[in-house]
Amino acid sequence: MTTQQPVAVLGGGSFGTAIANLLAENGHQVRQWMRDPEQAEAIRVNRENPRYLKGIRIRPEVEPVTDLTAVLDASELIFVALPSSALRSVLSPHVARLNGKMLVSLTKGIEAQSFKLMSQILEEIVPQARIGVLSGPNLAREIAEHALTATVVASEDEALCQEVQAALHGRTFRVYASNDRFGVELGGALKNVYAIIAGMAVALDMGENTKSMLITRALAEMTRFAVSQGANPMTFLGLAGVGDLIVTCSSPKSRNYQVGFALGQGLTLDEAVTRLGEVAEGVNTLKVLKVKAQEVQVYMPLVAGLHAILFEGRTLSQVIEALMRAEPKTDVDFISITGFN
């Protein structure tokens, strides 16, 4: 990537907008692609994304664009902040334009039909692209408001990691690198499920002991599942694992937490999602994770319990009673780290 080339951000949501602004603050020309011409015009005229980051001033170096072809042709470094459900349909027609380019996924989700992570879908669509992911305890509004933040860029491509670090690293945003792309991305996707549970617990005033128990048992479940799929367990002790889990399960700014909180207040799932007005990836992830955990025979009682509440007609009190009556096992599973870097 040359200094003259603009950096592309695909997606007009809160996180894509925060990253676009951050890139601009670091001196890059940024082209942010979005589907909605009205949204693009609002950003162009008012320098604000009113739907997703209201009150945040968007820098003049960020150019909102609706012509995807032009954006892809002009950029070598492309951050992909598209909803998991839209990634294939948006990018599949543009394979030739993406070959050899650096594609960095910002989306924390899992494809329902295949249980593939976003970077795996990118690899499938564009085998000749250079693929990475960015994940960590990164609430979009806090990034935009310059709260001190750290994240992880993960790829087997060391040069890509260095490019992303150089592009994003700044006064309030620190970028670490990892070669465990699968583990980093899986951590970002799985924690969304547990944020829904945490939001419900807060709405029901369950107490600090309960919240602490939920977060630590969630980390155990996440790690157990991830290791069964080949991830490095040590990744889950870092920013993309426990770091992301803590912030997502503790902050009312988290979209998945907000859905859980609304459910705890008595709203239906449809009502909670409608109130949010954005995609909450944890709801979709829960469905596919429950099936996958059964398929690979990994014990995930919190996942099973939340699924029972949202999709099987069970009440929260029934699920809590079943969870507390289950036989307690070891606190921390022993996982050999032999063979991991």
Curated annotation (Swiss-Prot):
GO BP terms: namely: carbohydrate metabolic process; glycerol-3-phosphate biosynthetic process; glycerol-3-phosphate catabolic process; glycerophospholipid biosynthetic process
Q: Which PROSITE patterns match?
A: NAD_G3PDH
Question: Which SUPFAM superfamilies does the UniProt entry name for this protein?
Answer: 6-phosphogluconate dehydrogenase C-terminal domain-like (SSF48179), NAD(P)-binding Rossmann-fold domains (SSF51735)
The UniProt catalytic activity note for this protein reads: sn-glycerol 3-phosphate + NAD(+) = dihydroxyacetone phosphate + NADH + H(+); sn-glycerol 3-phosphate + NADP(+) = dihydroxyacetone phosphate + NADPH + H(+)
Question: What does the record give as the active site?
Answer: K191 (proton acceptor)
| Keyword Coiled coil carried by entry | no
Q: Which GO terms describe its cellular component?
A: cytosol
Q: Subcellular localization, per the record?
A: Cytoplasm
Cysteine disulfide partners in this protein: none
Q: Which keywords, in A-to-Z order, does the entry hold?
A: Cytoplasm, Lipid biosynthesis, Lipid metabolism, NAD, NADP, Nucleotide-binding, Oxidoreductase, Phospholipid biosynthesis, Phospholipid metabolism
NCBIfam families under this entry?
PRK00094.1-2, PRK00094.1-4, PRK00094.2-4
Q: Which family does it belong to?
A: Belongs to the NAD-dependent glycerol-3-phosphate dehydrogenase family.
Q: What does this protein do?
A: Catalyzes the reduction of the glycolytic intermediate dihydroxyacetone phosphate (DHAP) to sn-glycerol 3-phosphate (G3P), the key precursor for phospholipid synthesis.
Full protein name:
Glycerol-3-phosphate dehydrogenase [NAD(P)+]
The protein's organism comes out as Pseudomonas syringae pv. syringae (strain B728a)
